[in-house]
């Protein structure tokens, strides 16, 4: 079952642009909600007429002890959250988790290391073995491990890494209020190295960190003017964590997530727009609106690094209610 009604005409050609202005994007973000949803739907139907949704599972391989001072993150050594530092899993343990994710229906397995940059030596060799193993299971492999060198990117490409996640987090203008230990340019250069190695990038941001609407438009402008667009664009809602500088912020209005997803879909028609952190707080109805607005991937599994995520059972019910197309045969 899908939501697609064959009697509703859809636009067959979608123009892909890389020259969006800040004013254009802000105007899209501020459109009346129904008009914004209609425009995003028109694009989404054209590029994804079967409403296919990718299920991506995310495992924290190395948790805590990160030298970055990201204001939102429970894993930073500068914050006083109660996250327990966890040593690197061995390769076998990670691949067992990947097998379980595949058995539950995931088709992409993402692995995260709480590092400022990838560490050469035994940790990096283990990372390469994990990527090889995930690929041998028939899953797409994604890694997030901070900054990396050209040589490290090349070796990850050699073992078949599909995507490297390195988020921009927020706009260039708001960035210094959130992070001081890594520059925006550092992030852009990391993405450049990944692309030069032939690996696709997974790159998005977080809303609800005290930014303005103009900041959100500015973040989207950076992403939408990358040529080519990121393969995946994760859209996160801040989950305030006790012990972090942003612990007292309120959860973002769910309709702001809908707007962000819809605008990302319009700007980057062929990218995967991934509903990421904060889904549990959004609720079922807002998540379905996000799927309607153009989200075509979710992070799937009971935890998302160090924050909770909807249960697999809840997500199966959500996706069935929405009528989107998922490879359910992986389960049954």
Curated annotation (Swiss-Prot):
Q: Name the positions where [2Fe-2S] cluster binds.
A: 110, 142, 202, 274
Pathway assignment: Cofactor biosynthesis; biotin biosynthesis; biotin from 7,8-diaminononanoate: step 2/2
Extract one GO BP annotation from the record.
biotin biosynthetic process
Task: List the catalytic activities from the record.
Answer: (4R,5S)-dethiobiotin + (sulfur carrier)-SH + 2 reduced [2Fe-2S]-[ferredoxin] + 2 S-adenosyl-L-methionine = (sulfur carrier)-H + biotin + 2 5'-deoxyadenosine + 2 L-methionine + 2 oxidized [2Fe-2S]-[ferredoxin]
Gene, per the UniProt record: bioB
The protein's required cofactors: [4Fe-4S] cluster; [2Fe-2S] cluster
Q: Which organism is it from?
A: Prochlorococcus marinus (strain SARG / CCMP1375 / SS120)
Give the enzyme's EC designation. 2.8.1.6
Which InterPro entries does this chain map to? Aldolase_TIM, BATS_dom, Biotin_synth/BioAB, Biotin_synthase, Elp3/MiaA/NifB-like_rSAM, rSAM
Q: What does this protein do?
A: Catalyzes the conversion of dethiobiotin (DTB) to biotin by the insertion of a sulfur atom into dethiobiotin via a radical-based mechanism.
Q: Which SUPFAM superfamilies match?
A: Radical SAM enzymes
At the top level, the lineage of the source is Bacteria
Keyword Metal-binding included in the entry's annotation = yes
Where does the chain cross the membrane? none
Check the record and name the NCBIfam families matching this protein: bioB
Q: What class of enzyme is it?
A: transferase
Alphabetical keyword list:
2Fe-2S, 4Fe-4S, Biotin biosynthesis, Iron, Iron-sulfur, Metal-binding, S-adenosyl-L-methionine, Transferase
Q: Where does [4Fe-4S] cluster bind?
A: 66, 70, 73
Provide the family line.
Belongs to the radical SAM superfamily. Biotin synthase family.
This chain's protein is named Biotin synthase
Every copy of the Radical SAM core domain together lies at 51-279
